A protein has these predicted regions:
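PTP/DSP superfamily signal
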Residues: 88-94, 111-173
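Short, glycine/charged-enriched secondary-structure capping and boundary segments
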Residues: 51-54, 110-114
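A phosphate-binding catalytic loop at a beta-strand-loop-alpha-helix junction
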Residues: 95-112
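Short, low-complexity, intrinsically disordered N-terminal peptides in bacterial proteins
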Residues: 1-14, 161, 166-173
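Glycine-rich, flexible N-terminal cofactor/catalytic loop recognition
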Residues: 2-60
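Short catalytic/ligand-binding loop motif for oxyanion handling, primarily in non-cytosolic enzymes
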Residues: 46-47, 68, 104-108
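Helix-loop module immediately N-terminal to the HCX5R catalytic loop
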Residues: 58-96, 129
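Short, well-structured alpha-helical interface segments that form or flank functional binding sites
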Residues: 32, 78, 82, 104-108
Length: 173
Protein backbone atom coordinates (compact mmCIF):
# COMPACT_ATOMS: atom_id res chain seq x y z
CA UNK A 1 0.00 0.00 0.00
CA UNK A 2 1.32 3.42 -0.92
CA UNK A 3 0.23 6.16 1.46
CA UNK A 4 3.00 8.70 1.05
CA UNK A 5 4.35 7.93 -2.42
CA UNK A 6 4.19 10.92 -4.73
CA UNK A 7 5.72 9.29 -7.82
CA UNK A 8 2.36 8.98 -9.57
CA UNK A 9 1.31 12.61 -9.73
CA UNK A 10 -0.93 12.70 -12.78
CA UNK A 11 -3.49 15.52 -12.61
CA UNK A 12 -6.33 12.98 -12.38
CA UNK A 13 -4.72 11.18 -9.41
CA UNK A 14 -3.87 14.46 -7.69
CA UNK A 15 -7.54 15.50 -7.83
CA UNK A 16 -8.69 12.14 -6.42
CA UNK A 17 -6.24 12.01 -3.53
CA UNK A 18 -7.37 12.24 0.06
CA UNK A 19 -4.46 14.17 1.59
CA UNK A 20 -3.70 13.96 5.31
CA UNK A 21 -1.46 16.73 6.61
CA UNK A 22 -0.26 18.20 9.90
CA UNK A 23 -1.60 21.65 10.75
CA UNK A 24 1.73 23.39 10.11
CA UNK A 25 1.67 22.26 6.46
CA UNK A 26 -2.08 22.61 5.98
CA UNK A 27 -2.08 26.32 6.84
CA UNK A 28 0.44 27.19 4.13
CA UNK A 29 -0.88 24.88 1.41
CA UNK A 30 -2.66 26.45 -1.53
CA UNK A 31 -5.78 24.42 -2.33
CA UNK A 32 -6.52 22.89 -5.71
CA UNK A 33 -9.50 24.25 -7.62
CA UNK A 34 -12.66 23.01 -5.91
CA UNK A 35 -10.76 21.42 -3.01
CA UNK A 36 -12.53 20.93 0.33
CA UNK A 37 -11.02 20.56 3.79
CA UNK A 38 -11.78 18.87 7.10
CA UNK A 39 -9.95 20.81 9.80
CA UNK A 40 -9.59 19.08 13.18
CA UNK A 41 -8.33 20.97 16.22
CA UNK A 42 -8.50 20.57 19.96
CA UNK A 43 -11.76 22.04 21.34
CA UNK A 44 -10.30 25.21 22.87
CA UNK A 45 -7.53 25.66 20.31
CA UNK A 46 -7.74 28.46 17.78
CA UNK A 47 -8.98 27.47 14.35
CA UNK A 48 -6.36 26.79 11.71
CA UNK A 49 -5.94 29.84 9.49
CA UNK A 50 -6.19 28.09 6.15
CA UNK A 51 -5.41 29.71 2.81
CA UNK A 52 -8.35 31.21 0.94
CA UNK A 53 -9.71 29.16 -1.90
CA UNK A 54 -11.25 26.08 -0.28
CA UNK A 55 -14.70 25.37 -1.71
CA UNK A 56 -15.90 24.26 1.75
CA UNK A 57 -14.37 23.64 5.18
CA UNK A 58 -15.72 21.39 7.93
CA UNK A 59 -14.25 22.43 11.28
CA UNK A 60 -14.32 19.91 14.13
CA UNK A 61 -13.00 20.16 17.68
CA UNK A 62 -12.07 17.06 19.67
CA UNK A 63 -8.96 15.75 21.42
CA UNK A 64 -6.63 13.04 20.17
CA UNK A 65 -7.73 10.44 22.68
CA UNK A 66 -9.29 7.03 22.31
CA UNK A 67 -11.16 6.87 25.61
CA UNK A 68 -13.80 8.83 27.46
CA UNK A 69 -12.68 10.45 30.69
CA UNK A 70 -10.78 13.29 32.23
CA UNK A 71 -11.39 16.68 30.71
CA UNK A 72 -11.08 15.37 27.17
CA UNK A 73 -13.60 15.81 24.39
CA UNK A 74 -13.69 12.70 22.22
CA UNK A 75 -15.01 12.51 18.69
CA UNK A 76 -18.78 12.20 19.04
CA UNK A 77 -21.29 10.41 16.86
CA UNK A 78 -22.42 13.88 15.71
CA UNK A 79 -18.86 14.67 14.60
CA UNK A 80 -18.78 11.37 12.70
CA UNK A 81 -22.13 12.07 11.03
CA UNK A 82 -20.87 15.50 9.98
CA UNK A 83 -17.76 13.90 8.42
CA UNK A 84 -19.87 11.40 6.47
CA UNK A 85 -22.30 14.11 5.31
CA UNK A 86 -19.36 16.26 4.19
CA UNK A 87 -17.79 13.30 2.37
CA UNK A 88 -21.04 12.49 0.58
CA UNK A 89 -21.61 16.12 -0.37
CA UNK A 90 -18.10 16.48 -1.80
CA UNK A 91 -17.45 12.92 -2.97
CA UNK A 92 -15.81 14.05 -6.22
CA UNK A 93 -13.89 17.08 -4.90
CA UNK A 94 -10.20 17.09 -3.98
CA UNK A 95 -10.05 16.54 -0.20
CA UNK A 96 -7.54 17.53 2.47
CA UNK A 97 -7.84 16.47 6.12
CA UNK A 98 -5.61 17.88 8.84
CA UNK A 99 -5.16 17.80 12.59
CA UNK A 100 -2.29 19.02 14.75
CA UNK A 101 0.23 16.29 13.94
CA UNK A 102 -1.45 14.74 10.90
CA UNK A 103 -0.82 11.31 12.37
CA UNK A 104 -3.87 10.06 14.30
CA UNK A 105 -7.24 11.87 14.18
CA UNK A 106 -6.87 13.06 10.60
CA UNK A 107 -5.45 9.68 9.56
CA UNK A 108 -8.60 7.99 10.93
CA UNK A 109 -10.89 10.36 9.05
CA UNK A 110 -8.81 10.27 5.86
CA UNK A 111 -8.48 6.48 5.87
CA UNK A 112 -12.22 5.96 6.34
CA UNK A 113 -13.19 8.48 3.65
CA UNK A 114 -10.61 7.13 1.17
CA UNK A 115 -11.85 3.56 1.66
CA UNK A 116 -15.52 4.56 1.38
CA UNK A 117 -15.09 6.87 -1.62
CA UNK A 118 -12.61 4.52 -3.35
CA UNK A 119 -9.86 7.13 -3.53
CA UNK A 120 -6.09 6.98 -3.00
CA UNK A 121 -4.71 8.21 0.32
CA UNK A 122 -1.56 10.27 0.85
CA UNK A 123 -0.13 10.60 4.36
CA UNK A 124 2.29 13.51 4.54
CA UNK A 125 3.43 13.51 8.18
CA UNK A 126 3.94 9.79 8.63
CA UNK A 127 4.50 6.58 6.74
CA UNK A 128 2.92 4.54 9.54
CA UNK A 129 -0.81 3.93 9.33
CA UNK A 130 -1.98 4.44 12.93
CA UNK A 131 -5.42 6.01 12.90
CA UNK A 132 -7.05 6.93 16.19
CA UNK A 133 -9.20 3.83 16.95
CA UNK A 134 -11.96 5.86 18.64
CA UNK A 135 -12.29 8.03 15.52
CA UNK A 136 -12.53 5.01 13.23
CA UNK A 137 -15.11 3.34 15.49
CA UNK A 138 -17.26 6.48 15.66
CA UNK A 139 -17.19 6.69 11.87
CA UNK A 140 -18.11 3.02 11.60
CA UNK A 141 -21.07 3.49 13.94
CA UNK A 142 -22.36 6.55 12.10
CA UNK A 143 -21.84 4.79 8.78
CA UNK A 144 -24.15 1.90 9.68
CA UNK A 145 -27.36 3.93 9.79
CA UNK A 146 -26.33 6.13 6.86
CA UNK A 147 -25.46 3.12 4.71
CA UNK A 148 -28.87 1.51 5.19
CA UNK A 149 -30.76 4.77 4.65
CA UNK A 150 -28.79 5.59 1.48
CA UNK A 151 -28.47 1.97 0.32
CA UNK A 152 -24.74 2.56 0.07
CA UNK A 153 -23.26 -0.92 0.17
CA UNK A 154 -19.65 0.26 -0.02
CA UNK A 155 -20.23 2.41 3.08
CA UNK A 156 -21.92 -0.54 4.79
CA UNK A 157 -18.88 -2.69 4.05
CA UNK A 158 -16.59 -0.05 5.59
CA UNK A 159 -18.85 0.12 8.65
CA UNK A 160 -19.05 -3.63 9.19
CA UNK A 161 -15.50 -4.61 8.27
CA UNK A 162 -13.69 -1.36 9.01
CA UNK A 163 -10.55 -2.42 10.83
CA UNK A 164 -7.44 -0.44 9.98
CA UNK A 165 -6.12 -3.29 7.87
CA UNK A 166 -9.36 -3.92 5.99
CA UNK A 167 -9.94 -0.23 5.31
CA UNK A 168 -6.39 0.06 3.98
CA UNK A 169 -7.00 -2.82 1.56
CA UNK A 170 -10.00 -0.99 0.08
CA UNK A 171 -7.91 2.02 -0.93
CA UNK A 172 -6.72 2.05 -4.54
CA UNK A 173 -3.03 2.66 -5.25
Amino acid sequence: MRFNDSQDSTPERERRLVRVLPRRLAVCREPLAGEVCISITNPRQSQAELEDGYADILRLGFHDTDQVGGNFTVMSREHAKAVLEFGAKHKDAPLMVHCDAGASRSVGVGLFLAAWLNRPLRLVATDVLEPNPWVVNQLRGAALSRAFAARDWRLLSCALFGSKEKLAKRIPD
